[in-house]
Amino acid sequence: MTSATKTNNSGSISSPIVVALDYANKDAALAFADQVSPQDCRLKVGKEMFTLYGPELIRDLHQRGFDVFLDLKFHDIPNTTARAVAAAAELGVWMVNVHASGGARMMSAAKEALLPYGAQAPLLIAVTVLTSMDGEDLRDIGITISPAEQAERLAKLTWDCGLDGVVCSAHEAVRLKQVCGEDFSLVTPGIRPQGSEAGDQRRIMTPEQAVAVGVDYMVIGRPITQSPDPEKTLREILASLTKVA
């Protein structure tokens, strides 16, 4: 089974940057996409944009040559989650995610749903602990261990289920690579270039710091999308990463 839209998991670009398209409307998102190169970044479409504009937005971005991370964080009963992940594969997205807290049966069902797509399947990533959450937030929902400990617990479960990696804080990267292996992909939001505001992220790092600790893909939003010159800002971040490498 193959997608009619785009070859997605090709690894055709080397940039670790995924730009979050957190715009109020589709025209603004596409205007941004027209300012940057698909060789310099991938693009993330989240709940708000996808709810408003749906698969058409994904197709518009694919037509411009971009790999798309569909960030919908599926969390439901196993059968429903599996079908949702398969639907994402039909769209030809490069990456899709689920919540690790949905449990082993849910994650295993999602992984199995992608088997018919073979090499065309998107990367399947699980969310561990949202980077907006700290220890107090976890205690409020009955979790008494630290965010780092909870992230490690959920990452191990994700690895056991055969998924490709996790969304996590960059602060957990070193430990998760040790526990789950170098081939286990780490996707990190909460990445802010030096001098940027933290916004609603509490556990943040700079791009250079993230690469140094083993992050594979870093999600950056407003520091790039709200820049007066997004292409220049993106290129500056990429240049800073070559120094780390």
UniProtKB/Swiss-Prot annotation:
EC nos: 4.1.1.23
Reactions catalysed: orotidine 5'-phosphate + H(+) = UMP + CO2
SUPFAM superfamilies hit by this protein: Ribulose-phoshate binding barrel
Binding sites annotated in the UniProt record for substrate: 22, 44, 71-80, 131, 192, 201, 221-222
CDD domains: OMP_decarboxylase_like (cd04725)
Active site (catalytic residues): 73
First-tier enzyme category under EC: lyase
GO cellular component: cytosol
Protein origin, superkingdom: Bacteria
Any one Gene Ontology BP term: 'de novo' UMP biosynthetic process
Database matches in Gene3D superfamilies: Aldolase class I
Gene Ontology molecular functions: orotidine-5'-phosphate decarboxylase activity
One Pfam short name: OMPdecase
Keywords attached to this entry: Decarboxylase, Lyase, Pyrimidine biosynthesis
Pathway info: Pyrimidine metabolism; UMP biosynthesis via de novo pathway; UMP from orotate: step 2/2
Subunit structure: Homodimer.
PANTHER family associated with the record: OROTIDINE 5'-PHOSPHATE DECARBOXYLASE
Recorded family membership: Belongs to the OMP decarboxylase family. Type 1 subfamily.
NCBIfam families on file: PRK00230.1 (NF001273), pyrF (TIGR01740)
Role this protein plays: Catalyzes the decarboxylation of orotidine 5'-monophosphate (OMP) to uridine 5'-monophosphate (UMP).
Protein name: Orotidine 5'-phosphate decarboxylase
Native source species: Yersinia pestis
Upper lineage: Bacteria, Pseudomonadati, Pseudomonadota, Gammaproteobacteria, Enterobacterales
Name of the gene encoding the protein in the UniProt record: pyrF
